[in-house]
Amino acid sequence: MKLSCLSLALAIILVLAIVYSPHMEVKALADAEPDAIGFADAFGEADAEPKRRRGLKKIIGKVIKGTGKVAGEAAASAVADAAVSAAIDAVVGTTEEPEQ
């Protein structure tokens, strides 16, 4: 009984391998990018990464820098407003806590 189950499992694996191997081969031939990256890595070329990924990294970097700049300006504005409010309170003589 164990031998027939093992034979059945191996037969199913063999059939699946035969059925799906042409599909995988076509898919591998259609996408040449992994081959190019593997070739560049194998020969130690510095430009192993596709140009579109480098472009995407530049765009993401610019977005992060811009977001950081806006957040920094907002924080500086909030600190400046709190300082002005504290200075006015000191001159006027109120003892209210500044809003946070």
UniProtKB/Swiss-Prot annotation:
Expressed by the venom gland. It comes from the Eukaryota. GO terms for cellular component: extracellular region. It is found in: Secreted; Target cell membrane. Disulfide bonds: none annotated. Its main location: secreted. Residues 18-50 form a propeptide. Glycans are attached at S85, T94, T95. Residues 1-17 form the signal peptide. Glycosylation is critical to maintaining the aqueous solubility of this protein, but does not directly contribute to its activity. Keywords: Glycoprotein, Membrane, Neurotoxin, Secreted, Signal, Target cell membrane, Target membrane, Toxin. InterPro entries: Pilosulin. Neurotoxin that triggers pain behavior and inflammation in mammals, and is paralytic and lethal to insects. Causes a time-dependent increase in cell leak current. May act by targeting membranes. Very highly expressed in the venom apparatus (5%). Belongs to the formicidae venom precursor-01 superfamily. This is U-myrmeciitoxin(01)-Mg7b.
